[in-house]
Amino acid sequence: MAAADALLGSLVTGLYDVQAFKFGNFVLKSGLSSPVYIDLRGIISRPSILNQVAEMLFQTAENAEINFDTVCGVPYTALPLATIVCSTHEIPMLIRRKEKKDYGTKRLIEGAVNPGDTCLIIEDVVSSGSSVWETAEVLQKEGLKVTDAVVLVDREQGGRDNLQARGIRLHSVCTLSTVLCILEQQKKINAETVERVKRFIQENAFVAANPNDSLPSVKKEPKELSFGARAELPGTHPVAAKLLRLMQKKETNLCLSADVSESRELLQLADALGSRICLLKIHVDILNDFTLDVMKELTTLAKRHEFLIFEDRKFADIGNTVKKQYEGGVFKIASWADLVNAHAVPGSGVVKGLEEVGLPLHRACLLVAEMSSAGTLATGSYTEAAVQMAEEHSEFVIGFISGSRVSMKPEFLHLTPGVQLEAGGDNLGQQYHSPQEVIGKRGSDIIIVGRGIIASANQLEAAKMYRKAAWEAYLSRLAV
């Protein structure tokens, strides 16, 4: 037992060291503010810990003397854990899809399904037990028996009892209380943190009234989250999180649209105004004297002043073509642009082509959901389709170019062009709205300003004014 305790202690501290256990203030999916967040997705990049977790899950099942024929991991974090267990111990594995595909086999369960077999469910973390139960229901519809589930961490918020009431025994490698005890003993966290987390657990249990009810989730109307809080949401893309954090740090939600034709002017704008902005948007194909050396200088300035570079390319072709446009040609956009954007018109292939290039480089994309020009066709069902496409490709798409908030998911960013301090328009159909209108009333996150700053006699003062107006509109929105 002492050896097992030492092994568990080593695993828990190892997981803490790779930030799988985070303590602070985190907004959960339900809208609750939690003092602890468990995120095991990162262990896929740490084979030693991944293997250790998988083996401890298997040993937990062995110690409980569970009889089973197959294993199914709850998508998605538990999938690699289930794969290692099955591969190491030569056990047949099943994969549950989150949604049925409209092509191929169209099955929700992949693998050799033998009705009457008993399937063991593997999960990383259990709160209410809903994720385990959803997987069990799908397996049972295929004629499989589900009697047990093993989990790395039981958050002790009612999941064990809820599953027991539905005929599923939950076996955990450890509970959250055990994690707290180990980390306090190792001086990773203090007693105050331990008490805060324990109080949260006690006050936020998920308990169903009877076994026939669907498993509960805490319902709470989420309030407007700060940029900083949104950066820490588990579903926020790393590029979006980076942008949100620097917005919070610099207190700016201003994107400068530097639509200039000379590289020298572009670099001067970036250097002079970089400290006031969160994003620099450019059209690289209108630079008369483009070179990759200019882009190197621009990325150096971006690091110095802490802003991201957004190439306003508006890709709108088939996947294979946009892939070549993104990574190759004269501009080699993927090598220097943190963000690009694309139209939804070509269908999901445009995103798939871009993400083949961008994902390995830690880049991201915005979809054009609405436009600020008069007579735009990007409205209604087109906008809805763009939102759906973003949700289906959230591993690469981090938000939208839009005139207003088109998605209620706080993980997505909304950037709005056509902003001036006073509403109006130009003779080419551009329509302008004020920062207060765009941020305060329409729910956008970032204003995109070009001529309002660049055409000003004092560009720095103009940038300060736009930054102040947009940030104050954001703060007012938080206060509502």
Swiss-Prot record:
The record, for Pfam families, names: OMPdecase (PF00215), Pribosyltran (PF00156)
Modification sites for Phosphoserine: 214
Give all N-acetylalanine modified positions.
2
Q: Name one GO molecular function term.
A: orotate phosphoribosyltransferase activity
* InterPro entries assigned: Aldolase_TIM (IPR013785), OMPdecase (IPR014732), OMPdecase_AS (IPR018089), OMPdeCOase_dom (IPR001754), OPRT (IPR023031), Or_phspho_trans_dom (IPR004467), PRibTrfase_dom (IPR000836), PRTase-like (IPR029057)
EC number(s): the record gives 2.4.2.10, 4.1.1.23
Name of the protein = Uridine 5'-monophosphate synthase
Protein species of origin: Bos taurus (Bovine)
